[in-house]
């Protein structure tokens, strides 16, 4: 049984988001023994219980108030939302934050030898998908009639098996499509992982802890997006150097022993530092340029 003051989080047991969800909780300091054969895991150091479930069960568990939080792909969330709206079922939730993983897109794909010029080429064809409601919404907006073929997996084999003329499925790199003789022709929906929360009554103890967890999640994501930069620069070129680096705050400037014309500069950069930027810094006279990852960050 769950204790009333423990926060219940639903996340994918196995699959695309599982490892990244675990890594996020671990980076937030949650000590939890996650075993794949168990459906429920309990944190050792925080009031958190994790339910390990199928990804398409997560939105419903949150909307029905079974769990407090859920980590789920926006594509799965939107599909469940559209399904529940069509059934006039409970579908309330709050999106607390879009996360920095689980990036993909739901796309239409055709066999490579099929001619495609625009969206009207899809009229009246049979399309295999695991996301019938997202597909219907998209094609209805384009006034495209079609026949749906619902599949829960291995959607990409449908054209070869004679089940459908096209597919609508998740794409990350496109390698799976290519391996099955398909090509992407139209993006239907862009998706990230997100953290959602149930609506309704959440007691003050849970609310306080969820706010604390959100602060940690924000810090973890901010740290991943940032780099700690250290370098030496000529005083005369200092402002030019700073203008190349987009920092969270103004840099720390330190004197260099035995050199009155140069200073050491430390700063947190909120953007990826590319080789081109480092080469520009070098041309401005910067030296000893170090770019370091940040493990944790709190503003």
From Swiss-Prot:
Class of the enzyme per the UniProt entry, highest EC level: transferase
Free-text activity regulation comment from the record: Feedback inhibited by histidine.
Pathway this chain belongs to: Amino-acid biosynthesis; L-histidine biosynthesis; L-histidine from 5-phospho-alpha-D-ribose 1-diphosphate: step 1/9
Cellular location(s): Cytoplasm
Gene Ontology terms: biological process: L-histidine biosynthetic process
This protein's UniProt keywords: Amino-acid biosynthesis, ATP-binding, Cytoplasm, Glycosyltransferase, Histidine biosynthesis, Magnesium, Metal-binding, Nucleotide-binding, Transferase
Family annotation (Pfam families): HisG, HisG_C
Cofactor: Mg(2+)
Entries under PROSITE patterns matching the protein: ATP_P_PHORIBOSYLTR
Catalytic activity: 1-(5-phospho-beta-D-ribosyl)-ATP + diphosphate = 5-phospho-alpha-D-ribose 1-diphosphate + ATP
One Gene Ontology term of the molecular function aspect: magnesium ion binding
Coiled coil region boundaries: none
EC number: 2.4.2.17
Stored SUPFAM superfamilies: GlnB-like (SSF54913), Periplasmic binding protein-like II (SSF53850)
Entry keyword Nucleotidyltransferase: no
Gene Ontology CC: one annotated term: cytoplasm
Family to which this protein belongs: Belongs to the ATP phosphoribosyltransferase family. Long subfamily.
Role description: Catalyzes the condensation of ATP and 5-phosphoribose 1-diphosphate to form N'-(5'-phosphoribosyl)-ATP (PR-ATP). Has a crucial role in the pathway because the rate of histidine biosynthesis seems to be controlled primarily by regulation of HisG enzymatic activity.
Subunit structure: Equilibrium between an active dimeric form, an inactive hexameric form and higher aggregates. Interconversion between the various forms is largely reversible and is influenced by the natural substrates and inhibitors of the enzyme.
Name assigned to this protein: ATP phosphoribosyltransferase
Species of provenance: Buchnera aphidicola subsp. Acyrthosiphon pisum (strain APS)
